[in-house]
Swiss-Prot record:
This is Type-1 angiotensin II receptor A. PROSITE patterns: G_PROTEIN_RECEP_F1_1 (PS00237), G_PROTEIN_RECEP_F1_2 (PS50262). Interacts with MAS1. Interacts with ARRB1. Interacts with FLNA (via filamin repeat 21); increases PKA-mediated phosphorylation of FLNA. Angiotensin II binds at residues 15, 17, 167, 182-184, 199. Disulfide bonds join 18-274, 101-180. It comes from Rattus norvegicus. Residues 56-61, 126-141, 217-239, 305-359 are cytoplasmic. Glycans are attached at residues 4, 176, 188. Residues 337-359 are annotated as: Disordered. Gene3D superfamilies: Rhodopsin 7-helix transmembrane proteins.
Length: 359
């Protein structure tokens, strides 16, 4: 959406250079429907994740801290999703006022950064637990995990401030509708470039490189362990899970990041073609559905890698209350083999162990 400032008389009034861009009847039906599905599935799934981790598993492991915070971040975003569903169903007419516009926009941005940062920390934790289990034991503590999560929430909040400051309700004069949108007073403003690049680099590129590196090193360590322990049957599920984690993250966010970058070029006036604007504005909500639906499934995806998580999850569905005492490990299907190449262990000591655990 390319917007031009026209007048200001108490209400911020603007002109839309491409008033028909992204405004299609199927979008106004399909997107609210998808938002509703994401809301129901996300609220149900993430609420159960919070209950299982906090009440059944008693929040005793490093990874459980990250997964709990991941689910909480998703719930914060999901609570604002009905607003966006109504907004889209009303053909991009925002009826909720300026304050909710800022809050809902900040929630979307906050969830993006918090989720990505938490997944990145989870990948680093898995790398340390599997490749350097002994050396990292003193560093991988509950205190460190909780402090890390506090820092992540602060960083995500800081990264979301531009949405609070610059996202506002505007009245578009040439279409007679009120929208919740970013608007830059000058085409020469460096703000959209900064926000777009921050979202592309800090919200995707750097985290993806760290996640890719962490799981690649885990992959290599496990392959080396299998070569040493040739008598042990190879479990290819481990490698499929690693591949799924990396590809799941990549393909969830790449479409949204690409169209975010194109939207910045439109806002800057680099792209003037309304046909391209229409493609971008039409694709943007679809990429948001892909990214945030997968985002909201992440706690379930990572949680169900653990046998104990699945056990407690099924207990919860059967209304079986948690026991007074609970085991402290959240093991995963990847817990069949470990390799400690940097812990100076003798070859005789390199035995299969349940160290590919979310612990």
């Amino acid at each position: 959406m390319a917007l031009n400032s026209s007048a200001e008389d108490g209400i911020k009034r603007i002109q839309d250079d491409c008033p028909k861009a992204g405004r299609h009847s199927y979008i106004f039906v399909m997107i609210p429907t998808l938002y509703s599905i994401i809301f129901v599935v996300g609220i149900f799934g993430n609420s159960l994740v919070v209950i299982v981790i906090y009440f059944y598993m008693k929040l005793k492991t490093v990874a459980s801290v990250f997964l709990l915070n991941l689910a909480l971040a998703d719930l914060c975003f999901l609570l604002t999703l009905p607003l966006w569903a109504v907004y889209t169903a009303m053909e991009y007419r925002w009826p909720f006022g300026n304050h909710l516009c800022k809050i809902a926009s900040a929630s979307v941005s906050f969830n993006l950064y918090a989720s990505v940062f938490l997944l990145t920390c989870l990948s680093i934790d898995r790398y340390l637990a599997i490749v350097h289990p002994m050396k990292s034991r003193l560093r991988r503590t509950m205190l460190v995990a909780k402090v890390t999560c506090i820092i992540i929430w602060l960083m995500a909040g800081l990264a979301s401030l531009p949405a609070v400051i610059h996202r506002n309700v505007y009245f578009i004069e040439n279409t007679n509708i009120t929208v919740c949108a970013f608007h830059y007073e000058s085409r020469n403003s460096t703000l959209p470039i900064g926000l777009g690049l921050t979202k592309n680099i800090l919200g995707f590129l750097f985290p993806f490189l760290i996640i890719l590196t962490s799981y690649t090193l885990i992959w290599k360590a496990l392959k080396k362990a299998y070569e040493i322990q040739k008598n042990k049957p190879r479990n290819d599920d481990i490698f499929r899970i690693i591949m799924a984690i990396v590809l799941f993250f990549f393909f969830s966010w790449v479409p949204h990041q690409i169209f975010t970058f194109l939207d910045v070029l439109i806002q800057l006036g680099v792209i003037h073609d309304c046909k391209i604007s229409d493609i971008v504005d039409t694709a943007m909500p679809i990429t948001i559905c892909i990214a945030y639906f997968n985002n909201c499934l992440n706690p379930l995806f990572y949680g169900f890698l653990g046998k104990k998580f699945k056990k407690y999850f099924l207990q919860l569905l059967k209304y079986i209350p948690p026991k007074a005492k609970s085991h402290s490990s959240l093991s995963t299907k990847m817990s069949t083999l470990s390799y400690r190449p940097s812990d100076n262990m003798s070859s005789s000591a390199k035995k299969p162990a349940s160290c590919f655990e979310v612990e």
